[in-house]
Amino acid sequence: MINSLLTRLFGSRNERQLRQLNSIVAKINALEAELQKLSDTALQAKTTEFKQSIQDGKSLDKLLPEAFAVCREASRRVLGMRHYDVQLIGGMVLHLGKIAEMRTGEGKTLVATLPVYLNALAGKGVHVVTVNDYLARRDAAHMGRLYNWLGLSVGVVYPGMPHSDKHAAYGADITYGTNNEFGFDYLRDNMALSKADRYQRGLHYAIVDEVDSILIDEARTPLIISGPADESPDLYIRVNRIIPHLTRQENEEAEGDYWVDEKGKQVHLSEVGMERAEDLLRQAGILEEGDDSLYAAQNLSVVHHLNAALRAHALYQRDVDYIVRDGEVVIVDEFTGRTLAGRRWSDGLHQAIEAKEGVPVQRENQTLASITFQNLFRIYKKLSGMTGTADTEAYEFQSIYGLEVMVIPTNRPTVRKDYPDQVFLNRSSKFNAVLEDIKDCAKRGQPVLVGTTSIEISEMLSEHLRKARVKHEVLNAKQHEREATIVANAGLPGAVTIATNMAGRGTDIVLGGSLDTVLAELDPDATEEDRFRVKTAWNRRHEAVKAAGGLHIIGTERHESRRIDNQLRGRAGRQGDPGSSRFYLSLEDSLMRIFASEWVQKVMRLMGMKEGDVIEDRRVTRQIERAQRKVEAHNFDIRKNLLDYDDVNNEQRKVVYAQRDELLDAESIKENIDSIRHEVIDALVTRFVPEHSIDEQWDLPGLQATLQSEWGLHLPLIEMLKGREEVDAERIAFLVQDAVDKHCAEREASIGAETMRALEKHVMLTVLDQGWKEHLATMDYLRQGIHLRGYAQKQPKQEYKREAFELFSEMLEHVKREVIASLARVRIRSEEEMAALEEQERRQVDTLLRQSQFQHQEAGGYGTGDEAVSLQRQPAGQRAAIAQVIRDTPKVGRNDPCPCGSGKKYKHCHGLVT
């Protein structure tokens, strides 16, 4: 109550901040008349003046009013567009490192020019992040005219561009690209073998367009660079053949072999189903006759393949979750409806779907490098974003990214009418109503945009409209090359456009059609009279569409997130234009069936409804929104859970990547190598000659043999120590260190100091990369089973952190040993031979990167996805056994003395076995 009273008195936080920014808007406006008097040359010279001021210590905040005023005046002269006051506010919000929520049609692309120009003056690079390559190239070309006029360089990065071009793009003051490309290049840079091979010059400032799509919707999709593994794909094909012989249950209690939990997106084998699957697998020769259980240790790979095949058949539908094109399974983005060429699901799911569809099955991939978007964008020193719908996710932006959301007022009041949802008993009644609404709009000359959740529905609607002879366009993943043309014409009188989800996002639908597109189609020799005639015709169309009610939005299904529904609605009513929206729902829709059907069915029964009847009630809409809020909260928990686990990986990633950067930047790492060598030798000697031990416990022959096999060093220790009294472990360590140092000095003298320095760097980088790659695979295995610790009354997250730390420490120790051993074994005779080795390694990395793929990993696991499913499918006896794991002796630490009494550390004795 007190809060609401204070808000009424002083305004909300958003309103108070807007008032503060309005005072700066007044300063910018006061400079406008003066700047308009300047010549082009004088205005362009302001950029050089600003750069000098920054070098002299002036802050960007102090420069902001004048820099924004200069950018606005330049935009007016070059682009013919002058920033409104609300756009100036949006620009300031972005500069302050916040998220600007701006409605569709408010000119977000133009708003971004203000903070981009200001921050690019610092010379550290600004990244403008878009959702697809088309928008990146379009905006770079269009806004590049303004930046170039002001003396700033612009680059754009996209997949497959030449190495030198990408270097130049990142060297520009402003770089446009997609979130995927910036992320991939960050990972590639951390696989580079020299400074010259790196693209990026640090992550300084990023403006993320459609920030909700990238930082929320895609936050469960880690970027993964992966290479093909060695396993044969044949097992996927053989396992796929048995799935049609298994029967799906209606629910958990019904008869059958497996049931599908749509809410949790899981598939469960019943007890009967497990026995049936075992029989079928034996008949197919996949399980041997003697195998007593599918879940025996030797059959874990078969379980992995069976789980993947069940999910492929039961949860993933063709033309909804993926399409088959040119003999390949291509993922369809659930949020945008676009195809994600090059992306692959992980954990064998993509291969299982390929086997299901009868296309060539590609090998599974091994992770080489990975990062989540959450951790990628948190690396930037300053981050901001803009979107039409962020306020519903304000808490997540603040808690995960530290980004505050500010709602920017519209330039003109919004007059769009949002009609209540219409709810039907079944899908056929719903789609009949949708078709009638479309036909009514087309008849009255009102353009209509129909939003669907899948390609399948968009094509079904298209077929019905074709039969009814209603002219229309379909915009989905299959037509994505024509996207810009379809969107440009979607505002024409009576135009009917069916769009999958939010395809076409980023391009405004202009009432009457796009004037720019029509003008661009004119002959280059067209006269002013021709242009005037085209503009007059467009004005007539524009007014006719406004009179018909503007753009009408039809939603054929509610999405899991209110934000995506709002994005669809937001396509209408841009810049004060008229418009309307309505959602048509049925009890058979996914969201209604899973989350809201029971309550609504109860209401429908009480009202005596039958097929074809409709409910149109605000209370139903509120109930649906309540269900959506539950789903949003659930999805947030999943993303937060992912981040908690990935933060562990991220700390390790930062250590490894910082080490790589030091290696690449250093002229010489001789001191590091010497230090590591002494450390490794100490550990080696301690392994065979433990400290404070008696000579009966020493293993001098073993130490001699190891020095010979791993180092190529013949050191007759036994002979050297014969007849000596008072010999202890410390003396032996000194003798070995001295011999190894002399051996290394001789090697360096034989090949030259410069070649040795290059060899040290090369070996250190190669071994570190290999160790990190193997560590990532180990961490994947740890993650997949960590939730089982809960059955032993332990906290999975704490266990994950503890074991991850131990694994990482062991990996670093292994890298040290391997570096020293490799340097001792490698035979290099000349500088030319060293250069050839480096070039060969570089070619291998290039080949690996060309073969690498972006896996669309479903990261909802860590005990909430496949891992939990595999446990639930196990026989009850096995589950109970897991729950009763109790340690009856104290755990032995890796560095504690081994309980066997050898005197060695546990990790060097029986710890090696475990």
Curated annotation (Swiss-Prot):
GO annotation terms (biological process): intracellular protein transmembrane transport; protein import; protein targeting; protein transport by the Sec complex
Cofactor remark from the record: May bind 1 zinc ion per subunit.
Catalytic activity line of the entry: ATP + H2O + cellular proteinSide 1 = ADP + phosphate + cellular proteinSide 2
Alphabetical keyword list: ATP-binding, Cell inner membrane, Cell membrane, Cytoplasm, Membrane, Metal-binding, Nucleotide-binding, Protein transport, Translocase, Translocation, Transport, Zinc
EC numbers for this chain: 7.4.2.8
Binding site for ATP: 87, 105-109, 508
Disulfide-linked positions: none
UniProt-listed PROSITE patterns: SECA, SECA_MOTOR_DEAD
Subcellular location: Cell inner membrane; Cytoplasm
Coiled-coil positions: none
CC annotations in GO: cell envelope Sec protein transport complex; cytosol; plasma membrane
Cofactor field: Zn(2+)
UniProt keyword annotation of Cell inner membrane present: yes
Family per record: Belongs to the SecA family.
PANTHER family: CHLOROPLAST PROTEIN-TRANSPORTING ATPASE, SECA INNER MEMBRANE COMPONENT OF SEC PROTEIN SECRETION SYSTEM
Description of how the protein assembles with itself and partners: Monomer and homodimer. Part of the essential Sec protein translocation apparatus which comprises SecA, SecYEG and auxiliary proteins SecDF-YajC and YidC.
Entry-linked NCBIfam families: PRK12904.1, secA
Name of the molecule in the record: Protein translocase subunit SecA
Organism lineage: Bacteria, Pseudomonadati, Pseudomonadota, Gammaproteobacteria, Lysobacterales
